[in-house]
Amino acid sequence: MTNMRKTHPLMKIVNNAFIDLPAPSNISSWWNFGSLLGICLILQILTGLFLAMHYTSDTTTAFSSVTHICRDVNYGWIIRYMHANGASMFFICLFMHVGRGLYYGSYIFLETWNIGVILLFTTMATAFMGYVLPWGQMSFWGATVITNLLSAIPYIGTNLVEWIWGGFSVDKATLTRFFAFHFILPFIIAAIAMVHLLFLHETGSNNPTGISSDTDKIPFHPYYTIKDILGALLLILMLMLLVLFAPDLLGDPDNYTPANPLNTPPHIKPEWYFLFAYAILRSIPNKLGGVLALILSILILVLMPLLHTSKQRSMMFRPISQCLFWILVADLLTLTWIGGQPVEHPYIIIGQLASIMYFLLILVLMPTASTIENNLLKW
């Protein structure tokens, strides 16, 4: 009799995705981040669910309810900090996952890549709305500044902002709807992630060489299940080190001050994982221009397949492109640093140069380098 896992309608799906899936024999640890993102999402949904049991989405009680969770709820503090730092781990995994995709040419799988970009946008929206919920100073002013960017849209901008706010400023209505959206979006992310996986399994995984691995496949289980478990253990170790030893390391002290519309914090800045985009936004001295640059800084990922001029898929055997890739990584780290600095000399000019460099690298230098490499190999 055939094994039940190969015949049962539900188990068959699991089997074909996680057990008998033919996987390339040479995928490195950079391929671990997909499963780690899945673990992060499950962890965020679970901790978020338990937080929602004690949280109240009203401006008068939101801040107090978070304090209540940390002080009075059994293990509330650990749930709260796992959720907050879990978001940071989520974005670390996201950036690594996208970086892997760029380096090894995974964007050639168009559907998988584009759904991935949609997932990135959705996750960023979810994280932004989650940051507003504790209703601290940075929550309130972050929400005010970011939602206000929509007013740069010609003609409908102001109406749009007031529609999102549910009034004439960030207030009760805004907090309530942000909580509702923050609750529902992770489930939408989970659904889109399923589609992401579905399209990936149509083609099979890419591998470090960028060459077809159809002639050299191994079963996902036990090889990559055990490898994923190791990755998961390391992820949980990193998360718990943060949660138990430095829970506020990545947070902003201003968020321990209740929201006050009459008092603006000296430096309004988002969580660390948005700082690179925030730096690009601030580097353009025009509101609409800044907003467009902000959106384009992420949306540029959609153009990657069009900007691929190399005859090789991966950067594994392309030293010039490798150098440019790591310069891009350094540039993003520079932007992240600048995003957290006050708007004054020399930070303004550094931010502007880093922003120009970001778009120049992706749109001009990397495609040019690929063409040069093609010619060097006399192709």
Curated annotation (Swiss-Prot):
Keywords for the protein's UniProt record, in alphabetical order: Electron transport, Heme, Iron, Membrane, Metal-binding, Mitochondrion, Mitochondrion inner membrane, Respiratory chain, Transmembrane, Transmembrane helix, Transport, Ubiquinone
Membrane association type: Multi-pass membrane protein
Subcellular location: Mitochondrion inner membrane
GO cellular component: mitochondrial inner membrane; respiratory chain complex III
Cofactor(s) named in the record: heme b
Binding site for a ubiquinone: 201
Keyword Transport: yes
Free-text remark on how the cofactor is bound: Binds 2 heme b groups non-covalently.
Pfam families recorded: Cytochrom_B_C, Cytochrome_B
Main subcellular location: mitochondrion
Binding site for heme b b562: 83, 182
UniProt cross-references to InterPro entries, sorted A to Z: Cyt_b/b6_C (IPR005798), Cyt_b/b6_C_sf (IPR036150), Cyt_b/b6_N (IPR005797), Cytb/b6-like_sf (IPR027387), Cytochrome_b (IPR030689), Cytochrome_b_C_euk/bac (IPR048260), Cytochrome_b_N_euk/bac (IPR048259), Di-haem_cyt_TM (IPR016174)
Transmembrane segments: 33-53, 77-98, 113-133, 178-198, 226-246, 288-308, 320-340, 347-367
Family indicated by similarity: Belongs to the cytochrome b family.
Note: Heme 1 (or BL or b562) is low-potential and absorbs at about 562 nm, and heme 2 (or BH or b566) is high-potential and absorbs at about 566 nm.
Assembly and interaction partners: The cytochrome bc1 complex contains 11 subunits: 3 respiratory subunits (MT-CYB, CYC1 and UQCRFS1), 2 core proteins (UQCRC1 and UQCRC2) and 6 low-molecular weight proteins (UQCRH/QCR6, UQCRB/QCR7, UQCRQ/QCR8, UQCR10/QCR9, UQCR11/QCR10 and a cleavage product of UQCRFS1). This cytochrome bc1 complex then forms a dimer.
Protein name, per record: Cytochrome b
